[in-house]
Each structure stands twice: as C-alpha cells, then as structure tokens.
C-alpha cells in the first residue's frame, strides 16, 4: 500500500480564509471603543514592547495548544515532546523528526496575517520598540519586523546537541528527503512547532543524519517543554523591558512562565501593561487595559485614521 494512503487523517486546508479561521477560538466582535482605548494607551508610549503568543498565528492557520475546542489539546491526546525525552531517547528523536519532516512544507509555507503586518508597520513608524515572541514560526520576520526576539527559539534552525554546529531547516529538509524518499506526502494537521501525526509503522524506518562536525544528535533550535530559555536571552528581554515604557501582550494566555515573567518584570518597574487576547490570561489582574478579542479584529485597525509619524 502506498505511503500516501496510510498518511490520510483529519485534513484541513490553509488555502481559504475560512479554513484559517478554524483554529481561532470562539470570540465576540470587537467593540470599537476598545480600539480607541488601546490607541490612546499606545499613543503615550512610543517605546512600548510587544509580547506575542500562539494566538496571533492561529489566524495564519497554525493551531495553538490550549484554546478550548480548537487547540491541539482539544483535538488530540498527543502531548508535545519533552526536552529530556528527546535528548535521551533515539526512538523519540526518530518519531519527532519523522513527523516534523512531513509537516515542514506546510508549516514553512505559512504566511503572516494582518496582525503580523500591522506590527511590522508600527515598528517602521516607531510606535513600538520591538517584538518578543513566544512563537517559533518566524511569521514576524516574514512580515518585515526587524527587531524580534524569539523566546523559545525558531523552527527554522537545526542545531547539534554536542557542538556549535547549525544548519538551516530548509537545507536539513533536503537532507532528510534524500534519506527518506518514501515520505513524500505531507499531511495537513500542523502543531505549533511544525510537528504532525503519522502512522508509527513508518517512523521505524525513518533515517536521521548525524552532525557532520562531531556525529552528535540534531535538534531544532526550539526550547522544548521541560527545558529553560537560555539565560542570555532572558537577560536580553529583561533589558528590553527596562528600556521600554510599557508592554502590550497579544494572543497569549501567559500560562507559560517565560511569557508571564515579562509581565512581572514590567510591573516590577511600575510600567503599564495592555493585553489583547481571546479569553482570560494569567495576568489579567495586572493589566492596565484588557481587551478580550481576536487580535486581527483589533491590531490592524489601530492608527488607521491618524497620520503616520514621520520617520527620519
């Protein structure tokens, strides 16, 4: 039987806007007064720092983990790979890379949505200092944002666990393809880290290259669950908070501490925090302004009817 026949499962299309919205949780229409309130909040803070989570990428067709009814925890019993499991188990590494290989073409083809593009525009207009993102999808960079810090790393880089070797994920995909010619059909169900679900019988024969420098094991440059954000990155973000005049959180429940910590650092400096997210967040009690809405209904509409600031 052909691999393509066995790889069929729940399939979704990212081609239409309707399909892209299927990963967006149920939400109410935005109140226009809320957009005005957020504009006023930002107008007095030209050096605001933006923290983004998976909620801004759901409108691009990448599901988050936790959203009720549409997140991956609601759709599947499969849990994300743990860092120590990946490091210690060759079977876990093989399973991860097989799924990631199949899902990569779809994941890497995902395009920024209106919120990503709006944030890139705000940076050009000097309305925001930078973007700190919990996402690994590089959509901010694709949209044109230049000052981006990826808290949890990037799915677009592969690193060796034993030395400093790095390789671009697209190049690594070509190597995997040459080693595994049978895996040519790509399922459509994407996890936030590019992972997908495929039959176990095909994972057993999947081949993974070793590091060309030292023969070590290769891993995406992503902070897996159970791992810690590198200290230099934590310190870099803390410095950005210190140099900001406020924080705007977009599309994050802030349940992961690496994101919540940024809010705590901001409030420790007695700086204001704004939040736009569908549903509650861990930091609602700390927010100076909270809007429960889809980011795409709010952020692209900001400053629409105001003259852009002149940028030298």
UniProtKB/Swiss-Prot annotation:
Protein name per Swiss-Prot or TrEMBL: NAD-dependent protein deacylase Sirt4
Active site, UniProt feature: 152
Residues at which Zn(2+) binds: 160, 163, 211, 214
Transit peptide extent on chain: 1-16
Entry's EC annotation: 2.3.1.286
Alphabetized InterPro entries for the sequence: DHS-like_NAD/FAD-binding_dom, NAD-dep_sirtuin_deacylases, Sirtuin, Sirtuin_cat_small_dom_sf, Sirtuin_class_II, Ssirtuin_cat_dom
Highest taxon of source: Eukaryota
Alphabetized NCBIfam families for the sequence: PRK05333.1
Pfam families, A to Z: SIR2
Family note: Belongs to the sirtuin family. Class II subfamily.
General function of this protein: NAD-dependent protein deacylase. Catalyzes the NAD-dependent hydrolysis of acyl groups from lysine residues.
Residue ranges of domain Deacetylase sirtuin-type in the record: 28-312
Organism annotation: Drosophila melanogaster
Annotated localization: Mitochondrion matrix
A Gene Ontology BP annotation from the UniProt entry: cellular response to starvation
Note describing how the cofactor binds: Binds 1 zinc ion per subunit.
Keyword terms of this UniProt record: Metal-binding, Mitochondrion, NAD, Transferase, Transit peptide, Zinc
SS bond partners: none
Cofactor(s), by name: Zn(2+)
Catalyzed chemical reaction(s): N(6)-acetyl-L-lysyl-[protein] + NAD(+) + H2O = 2''-O-acetyl-ADP-D-ribose + nicotinamide + L-lysyl-[protein]
């Amino acid at each position: 039987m052909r691999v393509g026949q066995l790889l069929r499962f729940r399939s979704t299309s990212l081609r239409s806007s309707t399909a892209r919205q299927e990963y967006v949780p149920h939400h109410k229409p935005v109140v226009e007064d809320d957009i005005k309130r957020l504009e006023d909040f930002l107008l007095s803070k030209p050096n605001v720092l933006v923290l983004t989570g998976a909620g801004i990428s759901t409108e691009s067709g990448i599901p988050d983990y936790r959203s009720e009814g549409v997140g991956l925890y609601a759709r599947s019993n499969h849990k994300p790979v743990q860092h120590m499991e990946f490091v210690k188990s060759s079977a876990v590494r093989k399973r991860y890379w097989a799924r990631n290989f199949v899902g990569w073409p779809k994941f890497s083809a995902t395009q920024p949505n209106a919120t990503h593009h709006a944030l890139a525009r705000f940076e050009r207009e000097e309305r925001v200092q930078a973007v700190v993102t919990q996402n690994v999808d590089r959509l901010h960079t694709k949209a044109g944002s230049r000052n981006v810090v990826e808290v949890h790393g990037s799915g677009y880089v592969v690193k060796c666990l034993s030395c400093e070797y790095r390789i671009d994920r697209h190049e690594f995909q070509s190597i995997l393809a040459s080693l595994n010619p049978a895996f040519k059909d790509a399922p459509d169900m994407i996890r936030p880290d590019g992972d997908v679900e495929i039959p176990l019988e095909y994972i057993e024969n999947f081949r993974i290259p070793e590091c060309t420098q030292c023969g070590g094991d290769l891993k995406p440059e992503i902070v897996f669950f159970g791992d810690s954000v590198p200290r230099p990155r934590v310190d870099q973000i803390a410095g950005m908070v210190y140099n900001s005049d406020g924080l705007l959180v977009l599309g994050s429940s802030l349940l992961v501490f690496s994101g919540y910590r940024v809010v705590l650092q901001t409030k420790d400096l007695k700086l204001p925090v704004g939040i736009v997210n569908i549903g509650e967040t861990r930091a609602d009690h700390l927010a100076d302004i909270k809007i429960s809405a889809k980011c795409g209904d709010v952020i692209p509409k900001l400053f629409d009817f105001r003259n852009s600031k002149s940028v030298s």
